[in-house]
């Protein structure tokens, strides 16, 4: 019985892996991304807790709404992570962020189970990043960004991201609790790996922007 309960709670517990992702994002100066990860963790954990034994008291919203925000937070997390990787200049970065936030809200409201909820944000972001990097390569007449970005960030991050999506859409029927938990872990790892080492808009030294707990809690 104890093993069964532990297995049922696995998706809820594994949702907490987004906390380290939020912590890493905040440390690197990506405060907006950290808030999105925390938002995703909160609603994903509560959503899965409603499925768990004896945890229905945590369901402070309708199950359907919790599911919506769980999927929505995940899609937006993918979007802001890839935009951070692309290192777009302002105001393009802010405009693209809002574009993703608004379009994802409508798309996921229509269908929160199909491939398009994630393939749309990922495909659009990858296309924009590819165009930008190819333009930079043409200007520099060399590799852009540095080789280390491809080997240490893009390559490993994309591998974990692809693994997460495969687990989510193709293997969950094997054993939902374990597979979905590994999906959470793989997704969080992809966010951490794809995020640049430093946000150039966050400032440095005494001028560095800081994220406190009060601000972080405002996202929920």
UniProtKB/Swiss-Prot annotation:
GO biological process: muscle organ development; myoblast fusion; plasma membrane fusion; positive regulation of skeletal muscle hypertrophy; regulation of skeletal muscle fiber development
Extracellular-facing ranges: 1, 59-64, 111-112, 175
Bilayer-spanning residue ranges: 2-22, 38-58, 65-85, 94-110, 113-133, 154-174, 176-196
Subcellular location field: Cell membrane
Inactivation phenotype: Homozygous knockout animals are viable. While, larval and early juvenile fish show no overt phenotype, adult animals are small and develop craniofacial deformities. Mutant embryos lack fast-twitch myoblast fusion at 24 hours post-fertilization (hpf). No alteration in the organization of slow-twitch myofibers, that do not fuse. In adults, fast-twitch musculature shows variably-sized hypotrophic fibers with variable degrees of fatty infiltration compared to wild-type siblings.
Its membrane topology: Multi-pass membrane protein
Stretches assigned to the Cytoplasmic side: 23-37, 86-93, 134-153, 197-220
GO cellular component: Golgi membrane; membrane; plasma membrane
Major localization listed first in the record, in broad terms: membrane
Keyword field contains Transmembrane helix: yes
Alphabetical keyword list: Cell membrane, Membrane, Myogenesis, Transmembrane, Transmembrane helix
Function field: Myoblast-specific protein that mediates myoblast fusion, an essential step for the formation of multi-nucleated muscle fibers. Actively participates in the membrane fusion reaction by mediating the mixing of cell membrane lipids (hemifusion) upstream of mymx.
Entry's family note: Belongs to the TMEM8 family.
Protein name, per record: Protein myomaker
UniProt source species: Danio rerio
Taxonomic classification: Eukaryota, Metazoa, Chordata, Craniata, Vertebrata
